[in-house]
């Protein structure tokens, strides 16, 4: 299969970088900041959620009224030092990228993590040189699609 593969698209968090646990911990930290101590079950429930699911859970379970953008902004602020400190690769991820690149396969990241944080994480993990393109959801502009990729060099 690698002989015919021309490109490979990867998610960043949880696929190349072992960062999902830290992202999911933000859910519990957020409600604790509001003075709420989640039960073990609630903590476990939140560890399995991301995005808009957890915002709905905050409303129904804790009566916390927040929106997705506000939650994302707080989580990204808290994750910057995590990425800056270096998030480890998932086992085998860096070696697999290198094997693909050695065979001429274009390697691409598509991530919901904002571009600035993604670049911090990928640079600290020394993965940028093995990527051809990086796409992040915050790069998408409904009016203009002219700047969709972040250069990797």
Predicted features, each with a name:
Residues 96-122, 137:
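Substrate-recognition element of Asp-dependent hydrolases with the DxDx(T/V) motif
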Residues 77, 123-126:
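Conserved ABC ATPase "signature" region
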Residues 42-46, 130-143:
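A short, structured active-site edge motif that brings together acidic residues
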Residues 15, 111-113, 149:
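Conserved phosphate-coupling serine/threonine residues in phosphotransfer and NTP-handling enzymes
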Residues 9-11, 108, 135:
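Conserved beta-strand segments that form the floor/walls of ligand-binding pockets within enzyme
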Residues 4, 127-130:
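Short loop/turn motifs at secondary-structure junctions
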Residues 146-152:
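Conserved small/polar residues in nucleotide/adenosyl-binding loops
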Residues 2-103, 116:
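N-terminal helical cap/lid subdomain that shapes the substrate entry/recognition surface
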């Amino acid at each position: 299969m690698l002989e015919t593969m021309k490109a490979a698209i990867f998610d960043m968090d949880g696929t190349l970088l072992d960062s999902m646990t830290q992202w999911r911990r933000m859910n519990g930290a957020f409600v604790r900041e509001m003075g709420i101590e989640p039960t073990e079950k609630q903590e476990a429930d939140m560890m399995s959620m991301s995005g808009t699911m957890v915002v709905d859970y905050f409303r129904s379970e804790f009566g916390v009224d927040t929106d997705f953008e506000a939650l994302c902004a707080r989580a990204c602020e808290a994750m910057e030092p995590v990425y800056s400190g270096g998030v480890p690769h998932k086992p085998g991820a860096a070696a697999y990228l290198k094997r693909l690149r050695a065979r001429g396969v274009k390697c691409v990241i598509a991530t919901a993590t904002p571009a600035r944080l993604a670049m911090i994480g990928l640079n600290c993990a020394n993965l940028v040189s093995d990527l051809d393109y990086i796409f992040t959801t915050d790069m998408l502009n409904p009016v203009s699609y002219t700047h969709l990729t972040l250069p990797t060099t």
